A protein has these predicted regions:
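Transmembrane helix-boundary motif of multi-pass solute transporters/channels
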Residues: 12-52, 237, 248-251, 255-258, ...
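Membrane-embedded translocation segments of transport machinery
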Residues: 2-6, 10, 168, 172-320, ...
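Inter-helical loop and helix-membrane interface segments of multi-pass membrane transporters/permeases
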Residues: 4-7, 35-40, 75-94, 107-164, ...
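Select transmembrane alpha-helical segments in multipass membrane proteins
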Residues: 9-20, 44-48, 86-100, 146-151, ...
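Helix-loop-helix connectors at the membrane interface of multi-pass transporters/channels
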Residues: 2-3, 77, 110-139, 240-243, ...
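A generic transmembrane alpha-helix motif of multi-pass inner-membrane proteins
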Residues: 378-399, 422-456
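Extracellular loop-to-transmembrane helix junctions
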Residues: 37-63, 143, 389-393
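Membrane-interface "cap" regions at the ends of multi-pass membrane proteins
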Residues: 1-31, 60-65, 69-82, 86-93, ...
Length: 456
């Protein structure tokens, strides 16, 4: 075992908030949130999401961040700090393994973004609007693999630089740019002819569009969007200084994440309405919305090529800030549990990313005939982590806080900076009752959907 490393730390509140917000504001906001909002009722989905974010999401962010800062350890060590029982180690390891499994396929999607951005920059954006472009690209094998490797190399280079010089510095640059771009593009989108109908659909709740699946889907999106139960917040909490407010930082991350999700919705949904008149089939496009529908929308705009460049720069920045957070969490686990140096840990994680990511990158091409329980590799890794492992990890965190540590200890950690825990009652109620119930609902619903018992 190598010599133990000195614990890294963020420079202060701004460093933590922008890094945590960067982890949260990723493809989940820019890509996933708009197509789910379009599919599950627009304004009513947004309303349900906001309610869940300020209750369920808030509670889990506070709990995970406090757990990390209390122990100064990544997930495995943080859970293990309260006992050596097998259940505690399992809870830590499932939180630690999730980012290791997510970041490879996440980087594949990041590679797709690089390809689209390069096409717009080179003046070939019109080709992206052609029928069959996306399917031909992801099934090409070599092109998809090269783009994935470029994105992976960029991510690893940032993580190699360290917490303060890599993760924090990049987040401090990319997040403000991301905000500005989102406002500019959303402003342009909502002024297109016919776009106001899309604004109304997205912002005005319509009870007629409400269903149980709206709630379940919003719960699942909140996990994906706020980086809950991925080990990231525990890891970032371990880098947080004692004089930084956990509650205040959590509220900043909540606001940042929700505003960017809303901006993403205003970028995409009004533009789709302007393009298609709110055609139901277009709104139901799902994951294809960004890579198939949006290029067609941009092609119909006067400044479509410029908007395409700005949009995919924004998406790339969002993807990078999240991928470095996922990778940092994985690297931190190897540093803590194996005593490895950052460079060795990052190198090993890089090898894992290439091996697992290549399965996803080639899964729609040369490896398309190989499936896992009927799913392509990327879809399987997404299902395994988001639908199965993350709800289990969230339940494990709730049980750790309520049955092992004690809610009072979390409260003490939250008030370390001398400020009162203003939403203590909300936290106590949610962590003891609704959070584990919500996580269990997501788990059961997702598995039932995968087995074909229900349709989401």
């Amino acid at each position: 075992m190598e010599q133990q490393h000195k614990r890294s730390a963020f420079s202060g509140k701004i460093g933590f908030v922008l890094s945590a917000a960067g982890a949260s504001v990723g493809l989940g906001n820019i890509w996933r949130f708009p197509y789910l909002a379009a599919k599950y009722g627009g304004g009513i989905f947004l309303l349900v999401y906001i309610v869940l974010a300020v209750t369920f999401g808030y509670t889990m962010i506070v709990a995970e961040t406090a757990l990390g800062r209390m122990t100064h350890k990544s997930p495995v060590g943080a859970f293990g700090a309260f006992g050596k029982k097998g259940g505690l180690r399992f809870g830590g390891w499932i939180n630690a393994v999730i980012p290791i499994l997510i970041v490879p396929y996440y980087s594949v999607i990041g590679g797709w973004v690089i390809r689209y951005l390069s096409e717009y920059i080179s003046g070939h954006g019109s080709e992206l609007s052609q029928d069959g472009y996306f399917s031909n690209f992801i099934s090409s094998g070599l092109s998809a693999e090269v783009c994935f490797l470029i994105f992976t190399a960029f991510t690893l280079a940032i993580v190699f630089a360290g917490v303060r010089n890599g993760v924090e510095r990049v987040s401090k640059v990319m997040m403000p740019v991301l905000v500005v771009l989102s406002v500019v593009i959303a402003g342009y989108s909502v002024t297109r002819p016919g776009a106001l109908a899309g604004v109304k659909y997205f912002l005005v709740p319509n009870v007629a569009n409400f269903s149980w699946m709206t709630v379940v889907t919003a719960m699942g999106q909140m996990f994906y969007s706020l980086s809950i139960a991925m080990g990231i917040l525990v890891t970032f909490g371990s880098y947080m200084k004692k004089d930084v407010s956990i509650e205040g930082s959590t509220e900043n991350v909540e606001i940042f994440d929700t505003l960017i999700a809303m901006m993403a919705g205003l970028m995409i949904i009004p533009a789709v309405f302007s393009f298609s008149g709110g055609d139901p089939d277009t709104l139901q496009a799902g994951p294809a919305l960004m890579f198939i529908t949006i290029p067609k929308v941009f092609e119909s705009m006067e400044l479509g090529s410029l908007v395409g460049v700005l949009f995919f720069v924004l998406v790339l920045f969002a993807a990078v800030t999240s991928s470095i957070a996922l990778t940092e969490s994985a690297v931190s686990t190897f540093e803590d549990e194996l005593g490895w140096s950052r460079k060795k840990a990052a190198a090993v994680i890089g090898i894992i990313m290439v091996l697992l990511g290549s399965l996803s990158a080639l899964g729609y091409g040369p490896l398309s005939g190989v499936t896992v329980i009927g799913m392509q590799f990327l879809d399987f890794f997404d299902f395994l982590t988001n639908s199965v492992m993350m709800p289990i990890a969230a339940i494990a965190t709730c049980l750790l806080v309520t049955s092992v540590i004690g809610v009072e200890k979390i409260e003490e950690e939250v008030t370390q900076n001398g400020q009162p825990f203003r939403r203590k009652k909300v936290f106590n109620f949610m962590i003891r009752t609704l959070c584990p119930v919500f996580a269990a609902i997501i788990l059961v619903s997702s598995v039932a959907n995968a087995l074909g018992w229900i349709s989401m």
